[in-house]
């Protein structure tokens, strides 16, 4: 079988910003409340003293360049290596990019997880924002996989488990990443996963829908490619399924050569079936369900048997064990049964033997309820811009007093809560919610249609994971639905207020190189520091071309204000010890060594979900081992 190379694709350009209401509130007010908060919910503060960063860091090579600046490797006086991202404020051209940058800094500075890139410090002056981040020395996961014909299952599980742990932590705190891909997953010096690039991340709420069509084409979910609203976590689950397929099989699940074929395959869930099935096939099938309601959640993945095979605890139980809890033998057997019941969910559609087995051996396996239907493609419904949309009213800000988008004034300090708009036409009174009928006799409001082509069309060069993701796109100006929280049924929405079209621009990258064409012939606006809320926007200095950045301009000899980041909780250690997998290997003959994946036969799989008898045998063997351990 000819191996299909991994394709590098750029990101879908996010749609026009309708997020001014939702994103203007501090991150602390919008985080999901929990009895044991995993993050400190504090605002970003300012130090009232200046810093000359050239005296604090020794700058080494440049890691990458982007639309807004560059990322450099640097060494502190203590010897610690860091990655420093510089953002030039005169490159920020619209409200949408402003919200992405501000949200990325707020979210990443609040997250504290061993597998997420940490922000150490943030500095700002009148012309630049400088972000000091954790440095991942071994590059990204794309290069790591490309250098190897195929990862063995143990290594694939090791990487995937760390990705799931970080993403599960984000979802527990109400954060959706929305741009998971190999290029945004870095490796540190110890070979551990570090997820980067939260430029497209956002907060999500149950019962409300997001509508930004963003992400990378080969990792985009059916909701994204078809322009349907989504809650958020289901988009990450789909991308996680694509990542698992790549880790296990070494190829992309969908054909990225042709746009029409790619959209059709994603919409129907018709991924390429490997010639050599893996034990993870059931989990891949569950994650790549077209119906988002039936798609595996991060809770399902964290408790799946394949993810936890060879580990003493499930991902969701690590925090409890760290605090002193100890699972009993009965709970271990129940966990094993739960893993198999969850992992076999997609298999129950066609496996009568498995259904009968669970009815006999697993309590509740034959519970009543709606039967599992055969997976099918979602019909191509009316595009989201054919529907009438509504903005969710924010109690902290009245949408009836929101001016038009073109009249918004950009704030001087982009990390500070924005002041209310001071000018623009105001639409008097909220519009009444009106359901939209899909009957042929009733006309649908005339709203610009989503393009039939172009969403996933053009390929982009690959980017560094330190960069934020959205890029310009030929079809970007046609994607008008921004990140809007829509409550209730997405079919019952009202039309948003018509506004001028914003330019779609990347956050820190355009084809991996610094762009000069976007600002030619224009006078870019600049932004002041955080202590200035409103003042006339000065024009850029005429002595420096708008598209040029000198080698020393990242810090030069300027003074910066340091921003006080939220305090972080101690990191949660990941545990590992002798497990069921280790005990099983004691009874097996020594392995003859790893073979090429195309040389292995189907019978080499020790626990394939395609064989019901193997499932039964492995389950009984695992129960026997658990009873001996208890």
UniProtKB/Swiss-Prot annotation:
Name this protein carries in UniProt: NUAK family SNF1-like kinase 2
N-acetylmethionine PTM positions read: 1
Annotated residues that bind ATP are located at: 63-71, 85
Q: What processing steps or modifications follow its translation? A: Phosphorylated at Thr-212 by STK11/LKB1 in complex with STE20-related adapter-alpha (STRADA) pseudo kinase and CAB39. Autophosphorylation is also possible at Thr-212.
Q: Where is the active site?
A: 179
A GO BP term, please? cellular response to glucose starvation
Question: Its Enzyme Commission number?
Answer: 2.7.11.1
Q: Name the protein family.
A: Belongs to the protein kinase superfamily. CAMK Ser/Thr protein kinase family. SNF1 subfamily.
| Entry keywords, A to Z | Acetylation, Apoptosis, ATP-binding, Kinase, Magnesium, Metal-binding, Nucleotide-binding, Phosphoprotein, Serine/threonine-protein kinase, Transferase
Q: Which gene encodes it?
A: Nuak2
**Pfam families xref list:** Pkinase (PF00069)
